[in-house]
Amino acid sequence: MTAVKITPTKLSGVVQVPPSKSLAHRAIICASLAKGISRIDNIEYSKDIQATIKAMQSLGTKIEKYDDYLIIDGTTTYTKQNSEIDCEESGSTLRFMVPIAIVEENKAHFVGRGNLGKRPLNTFYEIFERQNIGYLYKEDILDLYVIGKLK
């Protein structure tokens, strides 16, 4: 077996990604976690994508919205604590944002609508317990408080 060493380095350039809600969630989050300015083209502003944009903004990320692209300043992410994260009805936003909200020490309150609160979050609760992360939730509605930092 050959060992491969990966060295972190600053990337620049353009990546063409087809319009996709699934990829857009990931691109917004990755750009928000990058330590620089990113542009994401071909954005379609569905309700789920808008929920992810607002969720990252609630962590402090500066995001400028234009007709079909975003400018995201990842250097501002995690500048806010006591985050209120409204996932609307987006399961993707919820599942991505729970761990991202506590990469740094934070108090995060997740809310949402529709059937979002009925989705199982037991995997997260098990991780919270193993890592001594405080959490409080209500059954059948999305009203989740998380306090701490992932290890």
What are these regions (language model features)?
Residues 1-151:
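Structural preference for solvent-exposed beta-strand-turn elements
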